[in-house]
Amino acid sequence: MSSLRGLGNIARRWRELNGVSYWKGLLDPLDVDLRNNIINYGELSQAAYTGLNRERRSRYAGSCLFSRKDFLSRVDVSNPNLYVITKFIYAMCTVSLPDAFMIKSWSKAAWSKQSNWMGFVAVATDEGKEVLGRRDVVVAWRGTIRMVEWMDDLDISLVPASEIVRPGSADDPCVHGGWLSVYTSADPESQYNKQSARYQVLNEIKRLQDMYEHEETSITITGHSLGAALATINATDIVSNGYNKSCPVSAFVFGSPRVGNPDFQKAFDSAPDLRLLRIRNSPDVVPNWPKLGYSDAGTELMIDTGKSPYLKAPGNPLTWHDMECYMHGVAGTQGSNGGFKLEIDRDIALVNKHEDALKNEYAIPSSWWVVQNKGMVKGTDGRWHLADHEDDD
């Protein structure tokens, strides 16, 4: 998140910044408080990437590296004291998906053969409530793992979304079958997915709404790539089925593929108290996919990282789609007819956190964020072993 000073106006303007008026007059040029608000949620979305164990040699591949208690500080969120994580989300999928979506351990003693850690639910602390102006409940969904080649391998079939969209709100709302399967799949024999990711989140939303029923609350959903698609479905589900109890629900999604058909868009647009801002990087190919039969929901904010003087030109599909590059673009965009100037003091080294996007003259290594020694620790016997998992309290 940006500095606390940068978040200073959010408490006063949060309804406007979360889209009560559909962000009219705030996008071109981009309002500075909205920049900070977007990056606030963007960092939580990035955290769901950073916290994932990607090492397939580990028995914990596909799980979270850190415990809930220390998670936000361990993944280096700028203001970790604003939120406390109340629940981790786990998902499985009953349709075939490319490896970019679900990480499977090569170990015979894998922590789970089906499930992956897919994000978290968090709620504003008392300190966060002061800064943010209300008790904000956040759901952050993890996205795909770096690769974009999955677009060539993924079935784009639409399936009915009758579970998600309330009856009568549209004629025949349908969503991408793969996105819906990740959201709704469950297995009574599974340790982590006896409940689907959907019901893990909805039940936690209900619990937190009941806990803070006498306070002003909001629900904010965020995600990038696959996580953006899941965030769109989740936000629609929460409002369509009344889990928000009339408190406003906003989604901030980054690099989102398309989610559903025109009837799903119609259902989304007709839902009360529901807003969605799609942040899209002009050269990124993912938001253009799938094409046939799909329609965009929500309000679009277009950025163009190609205008940044800090990034290598022309870039490549990985850097165009990278979440840190998206936040860099939000920090510096000057609107559709402008250039690029960082309006927020956001460290340019972050764009190389997981990619090789920054110009070499800045002397920042590529893909520099790694767990110390890749999780290897030296035991008292002098031998090294992999210890890349913290038990969740």
UniProtKB/Swiss-Prot annotation:
<protein>
    <recommendedName>
        <fullName>Phospholipase A1-II 1</fullName>
        <ecNumber>3.1.1.-</ecNumber>
    </recommendedName>
</protein>
<comment type="similarity">
    <text>Belongs to the AB hydrolase superfamily. Lipase family.</text>
</comment>
<dbReference type="InterPro" id="IPR029058">
    <property type="entry name" value="AB_hydrolase_fold"/>
</dbReference>
<dbReference type="InterPro" id="IPR002921">
    <property type="entry name" value="Fungal_lipase-type"/>
</dbReference>
<keyword id="KW-0963">Cytoplasm</keyword>
<keyword id="KW-0443">Lipid metabolism</keyword>
<keyword id="KW-0378">Hydrolase</keyword>
<dbReference type="GO" id="GO:0005737">
    <property type="term" value="C:cytoplasm"/>
</dbReference>
<feature type="coiled-coil region">
    <location>
        <begin position="200"/>
        <end position="220"/>
    </location>
</feature>
<feature type="active site" description="Acyl-ester intermediate">
    <location>
        <position position="225"/>
    </location>
</feature>
<feature type="active site" description="Charge relay system">
    <location>
        <position position="321"/>
    </location>
</feature>
<comment type="function">
    <text>Acylhydrolase that catalyzes the hydrolysis of phospholipids at the sn-1 position.</text>
</comment>
<dbReference type="Pfam" id="PF01764">
    <property type="entry name" value="Lipase_3"/>
</dbReference>
<keyword id="KW-0442">Lipid degradation</keyword>
<dbReference type="GO" id="GO:0008970">
    <property type="term" value="F:phospholipase A1 activity"/>
</dbReference>
<keyword id="KW-0175">Coiled coil</keyword>
<dbReference type="GO" id="GO:0016042">
    <property type="term" value="P:lipid catabolic process"/>
</dbReference>
<dbReference type="InterPro" id="IPR033556">
    <property type="entry name" value="PLA"/>
</dbReference>
<feature type="active site" description="Charge relay system">
    <location>
        <position position="225"/>
    </location>
</feature>
<feature type="active site" description="Charge relay system">
    <location>
        <position position="284"/>
    </location>
</feature>
